[in-house]
């Protein structure tokens, strides 16, 4: 699921919040709401099966939540020598075994079973823009501000730099086994590539900077979207376009993306509070909701950091307002 780098892009998005608020979607209210960060969150990620979420809060470090029981499992602090939490990106591995959390300069990997940190790594030369974690924490994928993407095998230390991009990276993702990666950049291109060889598999061109990318965990689809009005679902086996999302807004930017387990639906979240459900086959928007905003912001707003399918009838979201919310699809 893609969502992790949105804090790095917020400045350019807030300009549009008040305009987008006028285009109100279905006014459905959440079935349930839980507070996971009292004064708001910097980042959040929900596991693909919607049983766990990791939240980076403004004053209380990093928390891992059991979403089935709304129970706090662990509270972590990446910056041991600082009272400020600076974690701006996070990812839960597809097998729910580990969590990666990242600031601009460093990242940590945590065990879900024990709550202990496996290690702490610093990133040199350029800031972290986005990060993804493979199953069993075998490898990590790091998108950087200088346009490079780095794949690191955490077991062997092997490091591969992908140098295909010309400008800063905005989003990265990889398959659960860590073998195939996707990266999107300000150079208007999304690349799908092999993490063993660095070989480009597919190149997806866009008319503006690519702000969001994602891979279906089952290896069926890729997703790429830009900063204006182009969002595509691609066949990961052939590289051919399956559909383009259909929307009427002049601009629609996404902060998170998730494919449904059966491969028929796409779930997106946006910096405008909007959560949307799409039919992959047609590109049509089926339904949309708005997450609860923070009331102390003007205009009252919230960024949807993560969204996931709980089952065929419900979805769950985490947002910058600090709330996890459960929504009914049908």
Which residues does each PLM region occupy?
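WD40-repeat beta-propeller superdomains and closely related acidic/aromatic-rich repeat-like regions
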Residues: 2-10, 16-330
């Amino acid at each position: 699921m893609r969502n992790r780098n949105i804090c790095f892009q917020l400045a350019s998005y807030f300009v549009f919040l008040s305009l987008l608020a006028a285009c109100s979607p279905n006014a459905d209210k959440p079935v349930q709401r839980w507070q996971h960060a009292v004064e708001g969150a910097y980042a959040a990620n929900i596991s693909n099966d919607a049983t766990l979420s990791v939240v980076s809060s403004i004053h209380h470090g990093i928390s891992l939540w059991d979403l089935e029981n709304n129970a706090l499992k662990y509270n972590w602090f990446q910056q041991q020598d600082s009272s400020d939490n600076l974690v701006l990106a996070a990812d839960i591995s597809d097998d729910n075994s580990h969590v990666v959390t990242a600031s601009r300069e460093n990242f940590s990997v945590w065990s879900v079973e024990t709550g202990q940190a496996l290690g702490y790594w610093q990133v040199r030369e350029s800031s972290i823009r986005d990060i993804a974690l493979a199953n069993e924490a075998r490898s990590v994928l790091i998108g950087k501000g200088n346009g490079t993407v780095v794949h690191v095998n955490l077991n062997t230390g092997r490091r591969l730099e992908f140098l295909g991009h010309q400008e800063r990276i905005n989003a990265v993702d990889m398959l659960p086994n860590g073998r195939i990666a996707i990266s999107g950049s300000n150079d208007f291109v999304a690349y799908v590539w092999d993490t063993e060889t660095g070989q480009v598999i597919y190149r997806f061109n866009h008319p503006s900077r690519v702000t969001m990318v994602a891979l279906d965990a089952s290896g069926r689809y890729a997703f790429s979207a830009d900063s204006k009005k182009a969002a595509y679902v691609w066949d990961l086996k052939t590289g051919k376009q399956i559909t383009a999302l259909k929307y009427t807004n002049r601009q629609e930017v996404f902060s998170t993306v998730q494919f449904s387990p059966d491969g028929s639906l796409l779930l997106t979240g946006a910096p405008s509070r909007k959560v949307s459900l799409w039919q992959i086959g047609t590109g049509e928007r089926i339904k949309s909701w708005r997450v609860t905003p923070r009331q102390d912001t003007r205009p009252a707003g919230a960024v949807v950091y993560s969204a996931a399918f709980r089952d065929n009838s419900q979805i769950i979201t985490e947002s910058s307002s600090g709330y996890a919310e459960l929504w009914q699809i049908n």
